[in-house]
């Protein structure tokens, strides 16, 4: 191997760790939960999904992924058509509004906001938010989904 090739290899070995660090720094997530001041989240045991989403219809796959994450918490999914169960449990049912936006260029953001309402009185109980920024739109979405999952787990897994 020539002297020039050895120098090039040495340079490449120095650049790769820097590139990895930059890539990791570019990928980030943020999330938070805001609760209504008088809300007792522990009383809620059920969730009813309906047509409670908003945002770009092209992001329905992300909306469905959020809905699936909610269904994986300790909240039991009820059907609005199961009238007897709904009437019996109405004071412990939440219904979510899921809003997803995604900037359509690489390096943009994906934002997910889930607002949980009391099924009886339509009052806001909790708002769970996340955002993700990565190298591609798909990466942004996966980061935001991971962040929202952590917040949903915090809010409902011990419920």
Regions found by a protein language model. Give the residues of each.
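Sec-dependent bacterial lipoprotein signal peptides
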Residues: 1-28
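Hydrophobic beta-strand residues in large extracellular and virion-surface proteins
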Residues: 47-49, 66, 70, 77, ...
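A short, hydrophobic beta-strand-centered structural micro-motif
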Residues: 49, 79-104, 112-113
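Solvent-exposed, acidic/flexible segments
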Residues: 55-63, 105-110, 134-145
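Amphipathic beta-strand/beta-sheet edge segments enriched in Tyr/Trp
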Residues: 100, 104-134
């Amino acid at each position: 191997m020539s002297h020039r090739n050895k120098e090039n290899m040495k340079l490449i070995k120095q650049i790769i760790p820097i590139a990895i660090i930059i890539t990791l720094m570019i990928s980030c997530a943020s999330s938070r939960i805001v609760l209504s001041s008088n809300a007792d989240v522990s009383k809620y045991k059920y969730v009813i999904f309906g047509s409670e989403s908003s945002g770009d219809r092209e992001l329905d796959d992300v909306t469905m992924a959020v809905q699936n994450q909610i269904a994986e918490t300790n909240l039991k999914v009820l059907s609005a058509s199961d009238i007897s169960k709904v009437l019996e449990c109405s004071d412990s049912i939440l219904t979510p509004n899921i809003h997803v936006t995604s900037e359509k260029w690489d390096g943009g953001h994906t934002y997910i906001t889930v607002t949980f309402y009391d099924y009886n009185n339509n009052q806001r109980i909790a708002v769970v938010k996340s955002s993700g920024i990565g190298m591609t739109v798909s990466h942004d979405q996966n980061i935001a989904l991971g962040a929202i999952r952590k917040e949903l787990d915090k809010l409902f897994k011990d419920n």
